[in-house]
C-alpha cells in the first residue's frame, strides 16, 4: 500500500461486526492499509453524536477517504474495486460478475441480517421473543440461505479453490 493510503483512509468499525469483517477482508486482499477507528457497539458508541456526525445511519463500517465518508459495506467494496482495480475481486465477464454479486447478495441480504445485533435486539425487546424462539428463527433462515449458497456453488463449473474460480472474489469477502 502507498503511504498516502495510510494517512487518508480511516475505517470506523467494530471487531465483531460481520459488515466490518468483510470490509477489512477486502482492504487486506487489495493490499490497502487504513487507520482503524474502533466503534464499540456494546457501549453504544455508534449512537453517540460523535459517530452520528461521521455516519448519520449510525452503523459500521464507515470509510473516510480524504475527508469524505463512504457507508454501507457493499458500496464501499464496489468503490474499492473501482478505485483499486487490482487485484480484482470481480471476474471480467458480465455474466460471471453477476453470479459473484448474487452470491455476495445472498449472504449480505438473506443470511447476515438475520443474525444482526440490532435485529436480534428488536426481537428481544420489541417483540418479547425468548432466546429459544430467536435461535429457532435464526437457524431456519440462515440454514435456508446457506443451503441456497451451497447449491449455487455445486452447480458452478468455475468453482475451484474459492467460491468462484482460483482467486478470492466479492463472494468470498462476504
Predicted regions and their residues:
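GST-like domain detector, emphasizing the conserved glutathione-binding G-site
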Residues: 4-136, 154
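Charged catalytic carboxylate motif
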Residues: 22, 99, 141-144, 174
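GST superfamily/GST-like fold recognition
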Residues: 114-118, 162-174
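Amphipathic alpha-helical packing segments from all-alpha helical-bundle domains
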Residues: 135-155
